[in-house]
Amino acid sequence: MAEFFDSLMEDHVEMIARQPVFFVATAAADGRINLSPKGLAGTFQVLSPTRVAYLDLAGSGNETHAHLAADGRITLMMCNFEAPALILRIYGRGRPVLPADPEWEGLAARFTLLPGVRQIFDVTVEGVQTSCGWGVPVMTLDHHRETLPRYHTAQDPEAWVKKQAGRTRSLDGLPTRATDRYIAGPTE
């Protein structure tokens, strides 16, 4: 049976911390619905019971950014692949925060930055739903993929920024803001 909450409860936060993967769904008023899996360790943070954020590394598209800039609606979903079975959905409003934005430093300090980070998605929680999850398989994590961070580590920083500057439209033609700097990863 589904239960609804106004904010994240402590048991929700504990469940989120155990998840190796989460899913992000966004849509603008018109066009495609985007659904993306995310799963690099340490990229999702619960900032408060009504605020979460996650690191976004440059990839093949930037649909989430375009949709949040146009509409703001976002749903995040986690599935407990261990016992007990549980699905948790976070409904909210999100926005992209790029390294050039004034709030970047404070938000980025909450994460260990990975090579190729282009933005952080900052989400205000408007509601939380849990459901049984009895249809979700029981699985164990073998390991996290390191391909994306390794790919970004191997890039020339100037060429990387130039490539990002050319990616300012979603699949449906919605505008995005490109990051203006290459982040190599954690600083000493």
Name these PLM-found stretches.
Residues 1-188:
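Binding-site signature for planar aromatic cofactors or substrates
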